[in-house]
Amino acid sequence: MYVEKVVTGKKMVFPHCKAQLYDPRNRNSSTIVMLTTSMERNPYRGMRGRTRGGANVRNKELSKGSNGISLTCVFTPCRVMGVCVTLMMMGAVGAAVWAVVTYCTMEEDTELYDVQVNFADQHLRVFDPAQKRWRQVCSSSANQLLASISCEEVGFVSLVNYSVTSVPEGGGDGGEFFCVRQEELSYGKKIKDSMYPCDCESREVLTLVCQDCGRRSFAADRIVGGVDARQGSWPWQVSLQYDGVHQCGGSIISDRWIVSAAHCFRDRFRIVNRWRVLLGSIYNKPVNANVAEVKTIVYHSSYLPFVNADIDDNSRDIAVLALTQPLTFNEYIQPVCLPAYGQRVIDGQMGTVTGWGNVEYYGHLANVLQEAHVPIISDTVCNAPDYYDNQITTSMFCAGYEKGGIDACQGDSGGPFVGEDSFSKTSRYRLLGVVSWGTGCAMPKKPGVYTRVSRFLPWISTAMRNYQNSPGIQKMART
């Protein structure tokens, strides 16, 4: 992790609020309140929708303006009236702004996640875009497959348990359900594409428990810059070591699987039993960490530098590792969530990259895990001639600052770039990127480049299913 300087956050102000006609689902009706904010900010630095009071926030349209960022949220006429009354009663601009922001952040959005697993009753719910409502899923002979795919779709990787429960007459979100066409169910495909509305005569619905992920027992310091990480603050981070020497980072995604980068496994690093995974420590020394053995390494067979060393294309730089024994999770060892199906990285979104990489380009590895917070840069900017001149493909994204100074570096490869979001009313971290490549470290207009994990969800899923009992080094093409 290369760090030249610390970039501090700027103060945000809320100068005005304006109303317009708009509805992201029905453009012929409804209203919105658009809260436009102005703030001093670093290039490419943005703001994301967050939750307040645990509500799920989705598709709060963010558009950059000349003075700041516009945060859009949907209101019905009744809600608008309620907010207006609230604003008048509060009588102070500061209190009024607080009310609008609170209401915006509590409004549940349904564009990003089509599937919900309710943590209160464990019922599976799928969004019906035609009726603009959530439906429970009627029990069927496809319950186990559907439950497993559902967990994957929301980024939870694996199913822990599923069951069937009865709902009373008039239950099931107004008595409406989805039934499933079993022949259309498939890993890597959204389950809503196999659903149709039904009455569910059995009155039995599917409930399930997915592997928990993306949660931390210990918070990290909210500092923008490269700093020593706290023990337990990034519990999915691992050190991949070959013959006892740190080579790359990786991310725990389940009790048996690690995600890393394909380029970590060049020809001279392909004797699988010489690899070890160090977990649960901010130090990259075995004496301070749990050590796991590797059974299988699967890398993407279309990672072109492995096909021809003269090819300068780092697309599909991804690999997964299977462990010989399942991990026991604790406060220092936890899996990170994968992106949900259809989830996209957002230009300007802040993320965190962690690793033990070089603290200088020609320097030495860090002894303590480093963390740095950097914004995602748009593909358009990153492909500009003075950046990477069209080398950024759809399977990558860039993150960093125009002036450089903070970046991943040698030794960080394969490690996580995570972003925080809220799903099912719980704040979680998702593995948005894998440290892949870059020109130098922390150079101006040469940000870090990351494998875009959302593009490889079907590949990861297939690799875990097909190679869980296949020891050795394996390669698998796209699915």
Give the ranges of each region predicted by the language model.
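Extracellular "complement/coagulation-type" protease architecture
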Residues: 2-479
